[in-house]
């Protein structure tokens, strides 16, 4: 069928999106530890009695203040316990989707008994690291995840090593679909979006379905900081206009409210983050509805948004001091601009203005307040699009923005990769001091 019309670069683009845009139930950092615990528990006969876990500072940062779905509790210990007692290790980022009420109760009892310990891995050279060691009597099993939220690199039990990842995994990364993104450009991504057969990218509509459902749930319930529902009330009071800009703000923040507040609905994630997936999806959906886009046009806009977000985030550490809702919103800006205008110059100007606007937003851990940053990023994206439609943008004479968008992206990402490392350490120190 359509495979014969797709060149190798386009195939890599599609595979990259399929790798990075996946359903995820719950914030992905605690879920990574839950997955390690579930995979370790699968190696034991019988019920886990005790858990020791170790995580990297960045994973600790993103796991301290976020609600684990179905538990009403925050933090890594409940994620580890529920993963071990009710998780499905084969479900990846949806490891907790089938956890029963009994498993939740048993996990809470395990915590209350003091049988779960989560510690910093020291020293730790990996930005994303989670290890869970589970015990039953004299038996134990240990699973280590490194580099990516679901990348199991080692499984070991009291009987010996069960699995260890091949040493050439990093070399294979260079030729993987994600590795190809290091040698492409936004112009090539746009050419792909404009010409790829619809059937080859129809799958991206699942992002609209899942994240749209989260948005509706966020408006129905009182999740997290309930930013979306609060702003909707202000519309009814006449304090906010009921217009397209407000709809983008409300519906995007509502999805993040539900996500961070512990709703038992999956998000379609991007680059290992549900909030990035929400930010790359919902603003584009709202604009698509406004312009009356059909499924094909929506799919192309979503593909541009998600692939642009992946392209930018691929130049960043998996976790850093930079709030990646901002980079996901750059993808959303591309998708929204494409729906209205379609020109590369408009898309490039919108992204450049985003870099000149929200590039300094820090990540101070996953929490309900992420919805604030998601809403800010979504609003900034729409503002940047409106400016670009009038042929206006932050120029290369200003700040870190360069005269071409590719260099602007590189400048932004170099900040996160180098200069913001000390910022990240300071954020983690501040958060750790609050925990004591």
From Swiss-Prot:
Gene responsible for this protein: yhaM
Q: Which BP terms does GO give this entry?
A: L-cysteine catabolic process to pyruvate
Pfam families according to UniProt: SDH_alpha
The name this protein goes by in its record: UPF0597 protein YhaM
- GO MF annotation list: L-cysteine desulfhydrase activity
Family assignment from sequence similarity: Belongs to the UPF0597 family.
Q: Which domain of life is it from?
A: Bacteria
Matching InterPro entries: Ser_deHydtase-like_asu, UPF0597
């Amino acid at each position: 069928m359509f495979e014969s019309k797709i060149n190798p670069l386009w195939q890599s683009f599609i595979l990259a999106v399929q790798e990075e845009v996946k359903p995820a139930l719950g914030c992905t950092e605690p879920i990574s530890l839950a997955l390690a615990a579930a995979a370790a528990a699968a190696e034991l006969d019988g019920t886990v009695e005790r858990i020791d876990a170790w995580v990297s500072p960045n994973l600790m940062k993103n796991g301290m203040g976020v609600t684990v779905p179905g538990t009403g509790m925050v933090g890594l210990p409940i994620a580890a316990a529920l993963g071990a007692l009710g998780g499905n290790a084969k479900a990846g980022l949806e490891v907790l989707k089938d956890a029963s009420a009994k498993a939740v109760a048993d996990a809470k009892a395990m915590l209350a008994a003091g049988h779960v310990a989560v510690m910093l891995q020291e020293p730790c050279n990996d930005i994303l690291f989670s290890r869970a060691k589970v015990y039953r009597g004299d038996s134990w099993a240990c699973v280590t995840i490194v580099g990516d939220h679901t990348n199991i690199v080692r499984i070991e039990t009291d009987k010996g090593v069960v699995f260890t990842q091949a040493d050439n995994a990093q070399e294979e990364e260079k030729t993987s679909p994600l590795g190809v993104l290091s040698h492409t450009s936004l112009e090539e991504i746009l050419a792909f979006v404009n010409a790829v057969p619809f059937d080859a990218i129809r799958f991206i509509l699942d992002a609209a379905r899942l994240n749209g459902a989260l948005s509706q749930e966020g408006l129905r319930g009182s999740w997290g900081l309930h930013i979306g529902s609060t702003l909707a009330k202000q519309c009814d009071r006449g304090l906010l206009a009921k217009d397209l800009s407000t709809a983008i703000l409300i519906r995007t923040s509502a999805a993040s409210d539900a996500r961070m507040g512990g709703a038992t609905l999956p998000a379609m994630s991007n680059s290992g983050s549900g909030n990035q997936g929400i930010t790359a999806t919902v603003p584009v959906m709202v604009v698509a509805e406004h312009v009356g886009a059909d499924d094909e046009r929506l799919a192309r806009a979503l593909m541009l948004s998600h692939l642009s977000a992946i392209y930018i985030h691929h130049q960043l550490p998996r976790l850093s001091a930079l709030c990646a809702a901002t980079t996901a919103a750059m993808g959303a800006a591309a998708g929204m601009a494409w729906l209205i205008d379609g020109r590369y110059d408009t898309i490039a100007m919108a992204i450049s203005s985003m870099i000149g606007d929200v590039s300094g937003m820090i990540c101070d851990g996953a929490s309900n307040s992420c919805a604030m940053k998601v809403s800010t990023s979504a609003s900034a994206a729409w503002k940047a699009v409106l400016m670009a439609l009038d042929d206006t943008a932050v120029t290369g004479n200003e700040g870190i923005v360069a005269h071409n968008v590719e260099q602007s992206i590189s400048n932004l990402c170099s900040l996160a990769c180098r200069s913001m490392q000390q910022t990240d350490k300071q954020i983690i120190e501040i958060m750790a001091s609050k925990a004591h």
